[in-house]
Amino acid sequence: MERMFPPKKPSTMNSHDRPMCVQGDSGLVLTTDPKPRLRWTVELHERFVDAVTQLGGPDKATPKTIMRVMGVKGLTLYHLKSHLQKFRLGKQPHKEFNDHSIKDGMRASALELQRNTASSSAMIGRNMNEMQIEVQRRLHEQLEVQKHLQLRIEAQGKYMQSILEKAYQTLAGENMASAATNLKGIGPQTIPDMGIMKEFGSPLGFSFQDLDLYGGGGGDQLELQQNMEKPPLDGFMPMNHENLCLGKKRPNPYSGNNGKSPLMWSDDLRLQDLGSCLQDDPFKGDHHHQIQIAPPSLDRGTEMDPMSEIYDSKPEEKKFDASMKLERPSPRRAPLGERMSPMITTGTMAQGRSSPFG
């Protein structure tokens, strides 16, 4: 190799006068080492790659064919052979250039990857934050809705409770008002009922007395019946011996000058018959108990005797024994029709005799 380059070195050194580098007319750059070496520049490497490509690749290309295709003066087979071998092994002759390019590419790819990763991570983080914010917002809205519904339910319950309380109060007030009205209505209504009982008590009592008198029961049975009928009337109304009389008073045009009218029975004709029969009653003197009944009189203006004088027995007479009278069986009587017919006949005759109108 040294034999091939001796004439080239002095010419290069003479032309440039530089001991460090020698450059020929072909553009080759050689080192200034004791054994000069060819430096593959970028242009020279590009021409080598083009020649290899034209020849069909590094496997088909040979140093001779490459040297013929390149046509560079000063380029020997040694240079091409070593460079082709490195090229085939993938090692570029221009190491620094390749290292820088590789490093730059790796840096660029790393930066791009970092950028992509950062952007993707930023997007992912942003999306995650947005999703978390959206989830929190929806949860907050659901909580607000639940709270609102709870408030509405509580308000509805309070409203229903107030309505029920008002209804209870209204019903209680109505019940109290109706009860008070009933109490007010019951108070004055009892008095007329008592008056009605007082009015109808004596005529009903005397109807049974008339039957007893005309049936022959005697004064004892009449007194017993009167004593048994008196307690219910005494329980309903207070006894006033001065004002309570048999029957009720009616205005009488035939009364005297003292202004008091005699007792008028509800049935005048029947009571006149009763008085006439009592005057002629044969059983009047046979019993120990005497009953005083004053017949109505139109001529005198005196007042009727009170009930106490009529029904009370005389001091010298014996008191009535209710147990004795209840134990004694009553005599057998005739039917009611047979007893009423003589009563009506006798009453008609007595009326003809004692009627002031007739």
UniProtKB/Swiss-Prot annotation:
A Pfam family annotated for this UniProt entry: Myb_CC_LHEQLE
Keywords carried by this UniProt record: Activator, Coiled coil, DNA-binding, Nodulation, Nucleus, Transcription, Transcription regulation
Bias (Basic and acidic residues): 311-330
Keyword Ribonucleoprotein: no
Protein induction: Induced in roots after inoculation with Mesorhizobium loti.
One BP annotation, GO: nodulation
DNA-binding feature ranges: 63-88
Biased composition (Polar residues): 343-358
NCBIfam families: myb_SHAQKYF
Oligomer status and interactors: Interacts with NSP2.
Protein name per the record: Myb family transcription factor IPN2
Organism: Lotus japonicus
